[in-house]
């Protein structure tokens, strides 16, 4: 197919970068933090600490809300420790104060005190809480962190068991055995839903980020606790810009962050967050945490208990929660062949991902948002690689503006025309003998492209008169091999050729091109690919 006419572009070298930034736009990092803070606190399910000897006694429970998990990290002294306090009550109205403490990631030591009077047990609990935090238990809703003391963190237990318990008037409690309906999804989609909602996958993702999964149990990641992590990083970001008189040191601020968001460093000293690169890594980590919370919250949607004998298959239920239609493409379909060629021609020469399945994606509400750009031309199908832990969140909410790749081209949504570029951001999971990952293809309304050849992390929008920013790399898929797909009446360019050198950008700081848009509505998810990495 003949090459397409080149869109009107402007190329900017390093000497023209300064002073070209458009007006201030909302910072996505801070907007995510504000959104988390606005969410009402979840109703807590409090369980007896599983390491407590009394936890196996069915009559033992936590008295009211007398339960707390405390954390303290001090980098200078290599402290990274927790303290758990619970007031327990058994069926005979005897009371127990359970204390457990130690280094994050370990079982630690414990102590148990028995009481016959509730008031004595309360006094013991409240005394220990004040001793460890310098706060009164009655004023815990207005908790203030103090240097050298523990900080109260919000952790939530997993949901109650899945079997339904139905109360019958004037009779004993009986359990209804539910008959699960057969799954209506095809086998490939069943596997997809299983993978993207896998608790083991979420757990492994958190462990890879050195997070202490015991302090952030799956199913109930505290939104408020994540929001406090955002606040701690904002303070670090300000401190990295330059020291202020009387301000806290980076070590102190880092210690506070690790206290708020518990990390498991084993016996290693927690590293101070003392560079923009480390700060960016922790920002990305919290954004992934927020997406894990979204996926987990979908599954925790409360349903009124019904005494019905049949219930939807769990995979059908999870699929419906996505509010996104996924249509598995036949391997003989023309668009399947086009996408397969796109993958194979632009994938890595050393280890190109092996295509397994393609789904056509139709996310609820995205079509209407995308319609706002119906008159914007120059549309291209582009790659977006991601962590499996955030696939469910993306299918539910679409691609959002998040810092990626160190923010080399500012705060926008990043795409690539070469699969090998986006594949570098794919984090998958082991499934049998294969390492499985997922990649998106999005239709991006590029409009007028503004080209750059050096980093510009301050960008929050294209220059006036432009709709997108392309960080041009040394190579680009051969434009003479491009083809088009018609998607909802729009012609969308799909590269089909191998990458070829771009002499005019041979001195670019980017080896491969990165495509940036700064409005979330300017792209639409079109395809989801399952690949073996």
UniProtKB/Swiss-Prot annotation:
The modification ADP-ribosyl glutamic acid is found at residues 12, 15, 26, 34, 163, 231, 309-310, 344, 449. The modification ADP-ribosyl aspartic acid is found at residues 141, 210. One of its GO terms (biological process) is negative regulation of telomere maintenance via telomerase. A motif (Nuclear localization signal) lies at residues 14-20. It is an enzyme of class 2 (transferase). Its main location: nucleus. It holds the Pfam family WGR. One of its GO terms (molecular function) is NAD+-protein-glutamate ADP-ribosyltransferase activity. CDD domains: parp_like, WGR_PARP3_like. One of its GO terms (cellular component) is centrosome. Gene3D superfamilies: 3.90.228.10, Poly(ADP-ribose) polymerase, regulatory domain, WGR domain. Residues 182-300 form the PARP alpha-helical domain. Widely expressed; the highest levels are in the kidney, skeletal muscle, liver, heart and spleen; also detected in pancreas, lung, placenta, brain, leukocytes, colon, small intestine, ovary, testis, prostate and thymus. Changing residue 101 to L: Reduced activity on nicked DNA. It is found in: Nucleus; Chromosome; Cytoplasm, Cytoskeleton, Microtubule organizing center, Centrosome; Cytoplasm, Cytoskeleton, Microtubule organizing center, Centrosome, Centriole. The keyword Protein biosynthesis does not apply. Its EC number is 2.4.2.-. Mono-ADP-ribosyltransferase activity of PARP3 is selectively inhibited by ME0328 compound; ME0328 does not inhibit other ARTD/PARP enzymes, such as PARP1. Mono-ADP-ribosyltransferase is strongly inhibited by KU0058948 compound. Mono-ADP-ribosyltransferase that mediates mono-ADP-ribosylation of target proteins and plays a key role in the response to DNA damage. Mediates mono-ADP-ribosylation of glutamate, aspartate or lysine residues on target proteins. In contrast to PARP1 and PARP2, it is not able to mediate poly-ADP-ribosylation. Involved in DNA repair by mediating mono-ADP-ribosylation of a limited number of acceptor proteins involved in chromatin architecture and in DNA metabolism, such as histone H2B, XRCC5 and XRCC6. Interacts with PARP1; leading to activate PARP1 in absence of DNA. Interacts with PRKDC. Interacts with XRCC5/Ku80; the interaction is dependent on nucleic acids. Interacts with XRCC6/Ku70; the interaction is dependent on nucleic acids. Interacts with EZH2, HDAC1, HDAC2, SUZ12, YY1, LRIG3 and LIG4. This is Protein mono-ADP-ribosyltransferase PARP3.
């Amino acid at each position: 197919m003949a090459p397409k006419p080149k869109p009107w572009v402007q190329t900017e070298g390093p000497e023209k970068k300064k002073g070209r930034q458009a007006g201030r736009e909302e910072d996505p990092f801070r907007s995510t933090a504000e959104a988390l803070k606005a969410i009402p606190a979840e109703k807590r399910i409090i369980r007896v600490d599983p390491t407590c000897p009394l936890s196996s006694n069915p009559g033992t429970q936590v008295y009211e809300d007398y339960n707390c998990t405390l954390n303290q990290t001090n980098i200078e002294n290599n402290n990274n420790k927790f303290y758990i306090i619970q007031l327990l009550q058994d069926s005979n109205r005897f009371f127990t104060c359970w204390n457990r403490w130690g280094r994050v990631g370990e079982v630690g030591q414990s102590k148990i005190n028995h009481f016959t009077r509730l008031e004595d047990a309360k006094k013991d609990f409240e005394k220990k809480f004040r001793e460890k935090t310098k706060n009164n238990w009655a004023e815990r809703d207005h908790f203030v962190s103090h240097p050298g003391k523990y900080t109260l963190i919000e952790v939530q237990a997993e949901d109650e068991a899945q079997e339904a318990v139905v109360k019958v008037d004037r009779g004993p409690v009986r359990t209804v055995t539910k008959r699960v309906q057969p799954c209506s999804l095809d086998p490939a989609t069943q596997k997809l839903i299983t993978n993207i909602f896998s608790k083991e996958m979420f757990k492994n993702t958190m462990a890879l980020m050195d997070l202490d999964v015991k302090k952030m149990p799956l199913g109930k990641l505290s939104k408020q606790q994540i929001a406090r992590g955002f606040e701690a990083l904002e303070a670090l970001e300000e401190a990295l810009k330059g020291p202020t008189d009387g301000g806290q040191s980076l070590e102190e601020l880092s210690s506070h962050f690790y206290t708020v968001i518990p990390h498991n460093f084993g016996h290693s000293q927690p590293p101070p967050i003392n560079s923009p690169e480390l700060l960016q890594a922790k920002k990305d980590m919290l954004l992934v945490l927020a997406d894990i919370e979204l996926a987990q919250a979908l599954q925790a949607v409360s349903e009124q208990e019904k005494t019905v004998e049949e219930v939807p298959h769990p995979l059908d239920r999870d699929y419906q929660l996505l509010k996104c239609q996924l249509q598995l493409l036949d391997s003989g379909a023309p668009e399947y062949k086009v996408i397969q060629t796109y993958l194979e021609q632009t994938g890595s020469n050393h280890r190109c991902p092996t295509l397994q399945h393609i789904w056509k994606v139709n996310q609820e509400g995205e079509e209407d948002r995308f319609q706002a750009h119906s008159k914007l031309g120059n549309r291209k199908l582009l790659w977006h690689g991601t962590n499996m832990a955030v696939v469910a969140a993306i299918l539910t909410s679409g691609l959002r503006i998040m810092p990626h790749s160190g923010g080399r081209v500012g705060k926008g949504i990043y795409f690539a025309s070469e699969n090998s570029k986006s594949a570098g951001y794919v984090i998958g999971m082991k499934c049998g003998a294969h390492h499985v990952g997922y990649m998106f293809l999005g239709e991006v309304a590029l409009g007028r492209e503004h080209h750059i050849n050096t980093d510009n992390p301050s960008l929050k929008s294209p220059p006036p008169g432009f709709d997108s920013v392309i960080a041009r790399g040394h190579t680009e898929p051969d434009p003479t091999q491009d083809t088009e797909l018609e998607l909802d009446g729009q012609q969308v360019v799909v590269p089909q050729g191998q990458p070829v050198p771009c002499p005019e950008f041979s001195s670019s700081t980017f080896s491969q091109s990165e495509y940036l848009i700064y409005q979330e509505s300017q792209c639409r998810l079109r395809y989801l690919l399952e690949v073996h990495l």
